[in-house]
Amino acid sequence: MTHPYLARAWAKTGADLRVPAPGQAKKVALLGSLDHAIRELVVHTSPTKRSSDFIAHLEQLDRLYGPRPGQPFTPVVLVEDNGPIHTSKLALAALAARAHWLTVEWLPKYAPELNDIELVWRDLKAHHLAHQTFADPDALDQAIHQAVGALNDERMAYPLAKLRISA
């Protein structure tokens, strides 16, 4: 959003935690995938959050991880929640078209605590994008991509001793 996200702010009980900011509040939708092997976050931003935006993110994953002619490919597992943009007819058809290399594991409904990327979103908002205002959605979009780059650099600089296995 173009208005600031307030992380760890203090106020009296019942008080409104809004910071006055010029203009209207606009949002930028953020779709992403976390590559556990190299700890890289891959994001797609859009002014909307629709099935077509999810498919654009799948096409981004095609370019990064999809099979290439004449080369062996490594199967990929994509962990998804049951959000409407992931379960629409259009999205399910796009996932089915990639079934030869992309396996989808569905999380239970209303279980964000099981989705590792939710922790990344929280970190991105609280540590990289908090307490800032943006002139317009394009400035926010640019800040998101810079923050993701910084987050990826930070995660690459301090690798895990062993990979986390979600089960």
Regions found by a protein language model. Name each.
Residues I117-A167:
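C-terminal anion-handling pockets and recognition modules
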Residues Q60-Q71, H145:
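Structured catalytic cores of enzymes that bind and process phosphorylated ligands/cofactors
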Residues K89-A93:
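Distinct, well-ordered alpha-helical segments
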Residues A15-P22, A96-L119, T133:
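RNase H-like polynucleotidyl transferase catalytic core
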Residues L58, P72-T87, Y110, N115:
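Acidic/histidine-rich, metal-coordinating catalytic segments
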